[in-house]
Curated annotation (Swiss-Prot):
Its main location: membrane. GO terms for biological process: photosynthesis. The lineage of its organism: Bacteria, Bacillati, Cyanobacteriota, Cyanophyceae, Nostocales. HAMAP family: PSI_PsaI. This is Photosystem I reaction center subunit VIII. Belongs to the PsaI family. The chain crosses the membrane at residues 20-40. The keyword Cytoplasm does not apply. May help in the organization of the PsaL subunit. It is found in: Cellular thylakoid membrane. It is a single-pass membrane protein. Keywords: Membrane, Photosynthesis, Photosystem I, Thylakoid, Transmembrane, Transmembrane helix. It comes from Trichormus variabilis (strain ATCC 29413 / PCC 7937) (Anabaena variabilis). The keyword Transmembrane helix applies.
Length: 46
């Protein structure tokens, strides 16, 4: 029963790549560089 349900989920989830590509390409680097910048510029770094 699960094997018949899985292809319909994968067919309906084809829009996910258009969501994850900008997230991985823009949001993750912005968050990473922002955190690293704030960490490096902080006063209490040993």
């Amino acid at each position: 029963m699960a094997t018949a349900f899985l292809p319909s989920i994968l067919a309906d989830a084809s829009f996910l790549s258009s969501i994850f590509v900008p997230v991985i390409g823009w949001v993750v680097p912005i968050a990473t560089f922002s955190f690293l910048f704030l960490y490096i510029e902080g006063e209490d770094v040993a």
